[in-house]
Design a protein with these regions (language model features):
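Short hydrophobic/aromatic beta-strand micro-patches
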Residues: 129, 251-253, 313-315
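Conserved small-domain helix->loop->beta segment predominantly found in fold-type I
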Residues: 178-181, 185-187, 192, 196, ...
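Short glycine-enriched loop/turn motifs at secondary-structure junctions
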Residues: 121, 244-246, 305-308
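Active-site beta-loop-alpha junctions enriched in small/polar residues
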Residues: 63, 92-94, 229, 255, ...
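Positively charged, small/polar-rich N-terminal and surface patches that mediate targeting and assembly
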Residues: 129, 278-279, 285
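Conserved PLP-enzyme active-site core in the AAT-like
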Residues: 1-218, 225
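PLP-dependent enzyme catalytic core of the Aspartate aminotransferase-like
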Residues: 8, 19, 26-27, 53, ...
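Short, glycine-/Ser/Thr-/acidic-enriched flexible segments
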Residues: 133-134, 195, 231, 255-257, ...
Length: 336
C-alpha cells in the first residue's frame, strides 16, 4: 500500500479483514496522510460509492480473517477497473493451491508466507505477486511508477520494467528504503514449505469439513461461521471460488460468553493457544482479546467478533484426535 498510496491519497478496503491489516490502514497509514474507507464488501454499491477521485486501490481478502467471509472478486474487480484502480487481494487464507485471484481480475496478490506457504509457523515472510496486467499510465494517478524517477536518473518503471513495473518499483524503492528483506535461510524454509503445500492443504481441507460438521451439530455451539454451510450468506460464493474446499481458519460462537470461551480454550491439549494460523498444528485463539483486541466494541461487532467467538485453525493431525480434543474442551465447560 505504501507503493500505491502517498500523502493525500485514499484506499477502499473490505471491512472484515485481519486486525493487523485493519490497524495499518486505519491508524498507521493515516500518519502518512493516507486515509481508508472500510466497506461491506458484499454491498457492491457501497464499494463503488466509496471510491473517491484520490482513491488509489481497492483491497480485499479472499477469505476474511477471522470469519472466512468471501467477497465477490469478479464483481469488485470490474468496479475497480471501471475507475482505473488496481484490485489488491490478500490470498493468505485462500492459498494459491485453492484459488488464483488473478484469474478473477486481481491485479496484485499478497500472501503472508508465514502461514500456509511456509506451513510450520517457523518463518516470517511475505510475497507480492504482480499480475503484470494493470496499466499504470492509463489513469495518470500513479506517477511514482509511470513518471521519470529522479532517484534512478529519470527512469520510468512502467517503461523500463513493463509488466513487472510494480514489483520492480517495490524492489528498487521500498525495499531499498525499509530494508524489508528476509534472510537466505528464511527464504529456504519458505521454498521448502511450498514443496508440500498441495499435500498439506488437502489434509487441512479434509479435516476442516469434519470439524465444521461436528461443531454445527454440537449442543454447546451457538453458531458456526463457515461458508461451506448451506445457511451461510457466502455459501454460493464459496462454491464459486472454492470448488475444492477451503477456509480451514474460521470461527464459532460457543454458548455463553467470555468465561465459557476461555474455559474451553484453556482445556484443549492438541490445539495450541497461539495467534498464528495456517500451521500443520491445530491452533486456537480468542480474537476479541488478542488478534482484534485493538478494535473497539462497535468495530468488533461490525466484524462479527464477540466475547464468545473462538477462532480455530485446523491442522493436519488425525481427525479423531482433533475432535476428541474439542469435545474435551466442551466437557470442561460443562464442568465434567
Amino acid at each position: 500500500m505504501w507503493s500505491l498510496a502517498q500523502a493525500g491519497d485514499h484506499i477502499v478496503a473490505q471491512k472484515t479483514i485481519y486486525g493487523g491489516s485493519y490497524n495499518l490502514l486505519e491508524h498507521t497509514l493515516t500518519q502518512f496522510g493516507v486515509t481508508t474507507t472500510f466497506v461491506n464488501a458484499h454491498d457492491l454499491a457501497e464499494v463503488e460509492n466509496a471510491i473517491q477521485p484520490n482513491t488509489k486501490a481497492v483491497y480485499l481478502e479472499t477469505l476474511g480473517n477471522p470469519n472466512s467471509d468471501i467477497p465477490d472478486i469478479d464483481a469488485i474487480a470490474a468496479i475497480a477497473h471501471k475507475h482505473g484502480l488496481p484490485l489488491v487481494i490478500d490470498n493468505t487464507f485462500g492459498t494459491p493451491y485453492l484459488i488464483r485471484p488473478i484469474e478473477h481480475g486481481a491485479d496484485i496478490v499478497v500472501h503472508s508466507a508465514t502461514k500456509f506457504i511456509g506451513g510450520h509457523g517457523t518463518t516470517l515472510g511475505g510475497i507480492i505477486v504482480d499480475s503484470g496486467k494493470f496499466d499504470w499510465k492509463a489513469s495518470g494517478k500513479f506517477g511514482n511508477i509511470a513518471d521519470p524517477n529522479p532517484s534512478y536518473h529519470g527512469v520510468s518503471f512502467a517503461d523500463a520494467a513493463g509488466p513487472a513495473a510494480f514489483v520492480t518499483y517495490i524492489r528498487a524503492i521500498l525495499l531499498r528504503d525499509t530494508g524489508a528483506t528476509i534472510s537466505p535461510f528464511n527464504a529456504f524454509l519458505l521454498l521448502q514449505g511450498t514443496e508440500t503445500l498441495s499435500l498439506r492443504i488437502e489434509r487441512h481441507v479434509e479435516n476442516t469439513k469434519k470439524v465444521v460438521e461436528f461443531l454445527a451439530n454440537h449442543p454447546q455451539v451457538e453458531k458456526v461461521n463457515h461458508p461451506s454451510l448451506p445457511d451461510h450468506p457466502d455459501h454460493a460464493l464459496y462454491e464459486k471460488y472454492f470448488p475444492n474446499g477451503g477456509a480451514s481458519i474460521f470461527t464459532f460462537n460457543i454458548k455463553g460468553g467470555r468465561e465459557e470461551a476461555f474455559k474451553f480454550i484453556d482445556n484443549l491439549k492438541i490445539f495450541s493457544l497461539l495467534a498464528n494460523v495456517a500451521d500443520v498444528k491445530s491452533l486456537v485463539i480468542h480474537p476479541a482479546s488478542t488478534t482484534h483486541s485493538q478494535l473497539n466494541e462497535q468495530e468488533l461487532a461490525e466484524q462479527q467478533i464477540y466475547q464468545n467467538t473462538i477462532r480455530l485453525s485446523i491442522g493436519t493431525e488425525h481427525i479423531d484426535d482433533i475432535i476428541a480434543d474439542l469435545e474435551a474442551g466442551f466437557a470442561a465447560v460443562r464442568g465434567e
